[in-house]
């Protein structure tokens, strides 16, 4: 039976491998990819972020890495987008937390789906494509805030919303509700930084992305 230290080391190794694969495919994302530390957290059954760490259940990481490694690439990018759009910092401002979670997931997945990179490629289901087309017509720009307003103003359909959750959910948002304030802007020391090729960057809290 593995010790806690061994499990944490395995999880860190997997996430470092995922991060490296993403970096080799999307070097412009280097600063952002290096902005999150890794922390084992057995309060989650999967993986999530609090905008400082990617918090993971090692069993989930190991099983997914063996069976469907491409899902981890996608999930890592999904979590980075949540941080970029600062979704976790607005979570407590919305009355319906589950709906806010759903809208955040739709918003970030629409962005990731628009990124043409094999490492994060996912075949778009008919159901997903149908809803993208519907929302682009009725909401236009798919931000979490606009999507939340859209769903709040229409007749609520719990069955539909659950189907959408199953389609767009990739990470555990429970860490968002535990956050008290924004994290300090500092380099996490849990792993070495990703090399940065372009010094011209713009900062989004603790995330940085190239300006060109």
Where are these regions (language model features)?
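Internal, well-ordered alpha/beta segment that forms a basic, Gly-enriched binding/recognition surface
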Residues: 96-197
């Amino acid at each position: 039976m593995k010790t806690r230290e061994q499990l944490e080391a395995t999880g860190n190794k997997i996430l470092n491998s995922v991060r490296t694969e993403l970096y080799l495919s999307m070097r412009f994302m280097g600063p952002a990819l290096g902005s999150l530390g890794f922390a084992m957290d057995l309060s989650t059954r999967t993986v999530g972020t609090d905008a400082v760490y990617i918090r993971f259940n090692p069993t989930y990481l190991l099983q997914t890495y063996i069976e469907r490694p491409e899902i981890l690439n996608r999930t890592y990018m999904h979590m980075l987008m949540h941080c970029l759009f600062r979704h976790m910092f607005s979570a407590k401002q919305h009355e319906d937390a589950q709906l806010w979670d759903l809208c955040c997931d739709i918003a970030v997945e629409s962005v990731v789906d628009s990124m043409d990179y094999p490492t994060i490629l996912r075949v778009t289901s008919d159901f997903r494509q149908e809803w993208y087309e519907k929302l682009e017509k009725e909401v236009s720009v798919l931000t979490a805030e606009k999507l939340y307003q859209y769903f709040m103003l229409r007749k609520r359909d719990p069955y539909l919303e659950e189907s959408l959750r199953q389609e767009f959910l990739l990470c555990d948002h429970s860490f968002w509700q535990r956050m008290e304030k924004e994290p300090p802007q500092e380099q996490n020391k849990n792993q070495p930084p990703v090399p940065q090729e372009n010094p011209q960057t713009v900062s989004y809290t603790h995330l940085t992305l190239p300006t060109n």
